[in-house]
Structure formats: structure tokens, C-alpha cells
Amino acid sequence: MLFRSPIREGIQTEDVHFAYTDGTSVLHGVSFAARVGQVTAFVGPAGAGKTTLAYLIPRFLRPRSGRVLIDGADIARVTRQSLRAQIAFLFQETVLCDGTVEDNIRFGRLDASETDLCRAAEVAGANEFIRKLPQGYQTSLGRAGSKLSVGQKQRLALARALVRDTPILILDEPTSALDPEAEKHFLTMLREVSRTRLVLIIAHRLSTAAAADQILFLKNGQILERGSPGELLSHPGGAYRRYVDLQTRGWTGSEPTDN
């Protein structure tokens, strides 16, 4: 079955369980809903299952049991190609090709206009540094973007994801290599972008999580709390509030790397 767009409602998971082939169990009965026009942040310590949960939506992984629904349609019953045409996914590790700045952004959507490219770069906070490059958008980036800083690479990868103009946008730590000013700019622009999209963010920075409409706080493969940043912070004994308090005191967590 082909997936039909546009997406009008959102994503829902129902009692999702997931385990890797080696038997490692990662998700345990996860249920949540995220709506179009809303930014939802997956937050929690390393090993909580945030990335695994995000990977289920474009079917990079399949749940052991439970369902993932988009607008009420079980994604297991639609073609993978038609599903992924609805989703732009920004991975944690930035990968660039050896071409120009324009080549790297256009890779997200080959028929994108120059206006589309510039708009995506502006939202990603990349337009300013691109304009300062020797040939602007036609500047060659060298092998795997070797001429750019880590933060600049991440902004180009963000622009590539944004130029796809898909109804679902999934961002894995999108601000991890951005300085505070660039992060603030990106989060401000993301609010505008999210008006007509469903945005999921895997957030490690508290400032990124604070910009979300909804936080899903995960630990040990379960959602312990959900709500707006203000709601969760208003509970002194809550799991998210404790996590924030520990983070602000410099604790980084001792759990294994996130699956």
C-alpha cells in the first residue's frame, strides 16, 4: 500500500516493544502521540532508547510488537519508499559529499530551486557563513567537507534535511555542534517551520528540549513522563526535573551509549 500525503494528524505508537537480534531489549511498551504543528523532544540519559524509538518511524528498525501509526495508518502496511518520502531524518553523524555547498544541500531534493536552497540554509543558520565563502554556494568543500568546521558541517546537514520539505522532520541532536547564538537562531526558525510539520527532536541539550511543545522523558526504554517543559519542571520530585537538576550540576550520566 502506498502512503498518502499530506499528513493531517500525526504519529502514534501503541505498546511498542523492541529488542536487537542479540537479545538486548531496548523499548518496553512505549506509547505516545505527536501532532502536526508540534515539536516533540525525546529526552533522557544515554541508553534510554531515544534513537531506537526515532528509527522505528521511517522503518530503519521494526518493532518486536506493537504498532507505529501515521494518521491512523499502520506503517508496516505501506511501502517503505512511500513512507520515507514523507520523512526527512537528520542523523547524529554528519556526512557530506566532495562537491560544492549547493551540491550538498541539493542532495536533499534534486529539483529544489535556488530560493528553496537559500531558505533552507537560512533556517539552518548556514546562509551567513556560506555567503562568506570564496565562491559562496559554489565553493568546493573538499573531501567529506574537510574545509568546514564541525558546526558548519552540521548546519549544512540541517539545510539538506530542511530542503526536502517533508511533513515529518526527525532531528537527532540538531544543535550539538552549534554555538549558543546559532542554536538560538535555529530554534527560533524551527518554530516557524513546525507550524505545518511534525517535528521530532532527540535532544541532549536542555536548551533544545526547552523549546519543544512536548517532552517525552525516557529512561530504560520506557516513557516515564510527558508534558510541556513548564509542566514537567513544575514537579520538583519528577523524573525530568531531577534530570535537569543533575545536568545543571554537571552530571552526564553513566548509562551505556544510546541504542
Language model features with spans:
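ABC-type nucleotide-binding domain
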Residues: 4-259
